[in-house]
Amino acid sequence: MEVITNPGQMQTLMLSLKKQGKKIGFVPTMGYLHEGHLSLIRCSKKENDITVVSIFVNPIQFGANEDFGRYPRDFERDKSLCEKENVDYIFYPSYEEMYPDGFQTYVEVAELSKGLCGDFRPGHFKGVATVVAKLFNIVCPDNVYFGKKDFQQLKVIQRMVKDLNFPVNVVGCPVVREPDGLAMSSRNKYLSDEERESALNISKALFEAKRMFEDGITDPNLIKERVRQIISQAKHLKEIQYVEIVDSNTLKPVDKVKKSDVLAVAVYIGNTRLIDNIEF
């Protein structure tokens, strides 16, 4: 496994591998890898000749009062996890390499960036789309793997790829959960034991919502009300930012719940913002 920090060197290497007919799979991450990331890496290993993992905590997708400074970082740990999974290359650029002086070009996916997390994290998806567009141009992947836990992010990237004709196939992979139901996230590290216990109400609420739908309930308000009830019982709940049921393509709220619609939530447990979702 090789670690590459220079974008130009990375791009040259990837282009030469593609010339040799190699199929490149790419897993973009912000590091502090967990089983969710590893499941993406395994998908890539299965479907491609070369697997690249990028590790870059992207400052332009964090708002002024968000957790950029304290976001967990441990490169040596990430590196050894990647080695165990037989990753071929880690792309690990510095901030200066990605955003040199004078940088002023941004990518914005207008409609899909609105609503859900977009309402609470202005500029977030502009930061995500911009860094991912840059990474696509540097890594030149055939296939790229994103977790469905960040459902809105996945939709934003799919739209960007379509609208800007990126020659890449975007693969959305299922949410990976802890045995007790908690969706895996690098931010889970912030939770105390008691807060982690409280956070279980999130997945509990989602599973209950799915059960209601399977029992024939299609009124989104009834389902959302029940979800709020369950989450509100969490001892360390600080705030429910949103509970929405949206169409999985447009991300617009629905009047009647149908199969493949998505229930998405964002919740503060203590000082930690957690998101999760489930498909009906």
From Swiss-Prot:
Pfam families: Pantoate_ligase. Its EC number is 6.3.2.1. One of its GO terms (molecular function) is ATP binding. It is an enzyme of class 6 (ligase). It catalyses: (R)-pantoate + beta-alanine + ATP = (R)-pantothenate + AMP + diphosphate + H(+). It is found in: Cytoplasm. (R)-pantoate binds at Q61, Q153. GO terms for cellular component: cytosol. ATP binds at residues 30-37, 147-150, 176, 184-187. The keyword Lipid metabolism does not apply. Beta-alanine binds at Q61. Keywords: ATP-binding, Cytoplasm, Ligase, Nucleotide-binding, Pantothenate biosynthesis. It comes from the Bacteria. The active site is at H37 (proton donor). Pathway: Cofactor biosynthesis; (R)-pantothenate biosynthesis; (R)-pantothenate from (R)-pantoate and beta-alanine: step 1/1. Homodimer. Catalyzes the condensation of pantoate with beta-alanine in an ATP-dependent reaction via a pantoyl-adenylate intermediate. HAMAP family: PanC (MF_00158). Belongs to the pantothenate synthetase family. This is Pantothenate synthetase. It comes from Sulfurihydrogenibium sp. (strain YO3AOP1). The gene is panC.
